[in-house]
Curated annotation (Swiss-Prot):
This is Large-conductance mechanosensitive channel. GO terms for molecular function: mechanosensitive monoatomic ion channel activity. Channel that opens in response to stretch forces in the membrane lipid bilayer. May participate in the regulation of osmotic pressure changes within the cell. The lineage of its organism: Bacteria, Bacillati, Bacillota, Clostridia, Eubacteriales. It comes from Clostridium beijerinckii (strain ATCC 51743 / NCIMB 8052). It is found in: Cell membrane. InterPro entries: MS_channel, MSC/AndL, MscL_channel. It comes from the Bacteria.
Length: 146
């Protein structure tokens, strides 16, 4: 069982996925910092010194200046400013991933144009076979190279 797990874990896709998750986590921290520390303060300044992380309304009685004051008083709050920050964070991450995938697709398309196809069909039995095969494994016909 350990041997099977080792084979599974060492496959190229599994390692690539693990690397992608680690890099994605680090990238997410960078984007979150960009949104919270650079973009939203600038937007808040342009809108009259609004601090988006402190935009909220209470679901109970009382008048509180900050989210923390309301939480300390035990009053439930709807923190729509933090939600706006998270939406902007998500949009930046989604757009960045879109751009990266688009560029990778362009690169692989250009590289893939000159590659010999992996599969071809046997002209006798129409079975899909390896493009470098000289004999069909299904009908055993000898295949002449094109």
């Amino acid at each position: 069982m350990f041997k099977e797990f080792k084979e599974f874990a060492m496959k190229g896709n599994m390692v690539s996925l693990a690397i992608g998750v680690v890099i994605g986590g680090a990238f997410s921290k960078i984007v979150t910092s960009l949104v919270n520390d650079i973009i939203m303060p600038l937007v808040g300044l342009l809108m009259g010194r609004v601090d988006f992380s402190n935009l909220f309304f209470t679901l109970g009685s009382g008048n509180f200046k900050t989210v923390q004051e309301a939480k300390d008083a035990g009053v439930a709050t709807v923190n729509y400013g933090i939600f706006i920050n998270n939406i902007i964070d998500f949009l930046i991450v989604a757009f960045s991933i879109f751009i990266i995938i688009q560029q990778i697709s362009k690169l692989t398309k250009k590289k893939g144009e000159n590659i010999v196809p992996d599969k071809k069909k046997c002209k006798y039995c129409y079975t899909e076979i390896n493009s470098q095969a000289t004999r069909c494994p299904n009908c055993t016909s000898e295949l002449k190279e094109n």
